[in-house]
């Protein structure tokens, strides 16, 4: 099986992992956070922008995403996150399946973390 890493140059890593991995026609992107921004809306957009860059680096687009998992530091931020996420996927013919939930804490004080996986 052909397996390769997908990297995000200049991005801070918080552990020993790849930003993404593609194996055959399937890909997985590690959770993306954007702690350089304040507020859940801006952090959500920042994480989505990183995902777009990773997808582009792998020759993929948002259309290739099959599943998104969204972790929130505070479930009360769900509506604000959902507004930004909804705008991101509004043009997709088939929206990704998704799970969203609160976690006790996220890396580096992030308010939101987004994980995606999909296929070519």
Walk through the language-model features, giving the residues of each.
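N-terminal presequence-like segments and the immediate start of the first folded domain
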Residues: 1-66, 72-120
């Amino acid at each position: 099986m052909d397996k390769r890493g997908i990297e995000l140059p200049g991005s801070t890593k918080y552990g020993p992992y790849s930003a993404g991995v593609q194996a055959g026609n399937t890909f997985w992107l590690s959770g993306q956070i954007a702690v350089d921004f304040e507020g859940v809306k801006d952090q959500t957009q920042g994480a989505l922008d990183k995902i777009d860059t990773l997808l582009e680096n792998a020759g993929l687009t948002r259309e290739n995403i099959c599943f998104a998992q969204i972790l929130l530091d505070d479930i009360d931020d769900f509506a604000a996150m959902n507004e930004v996420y909804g705008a991101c996927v509004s043009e997709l013919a088939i929206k990704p399946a998704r799970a969203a939930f609160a976690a006790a804490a996220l890396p580096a004080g992030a308010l939101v973390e987004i994980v995606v996986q999909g296929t070519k």
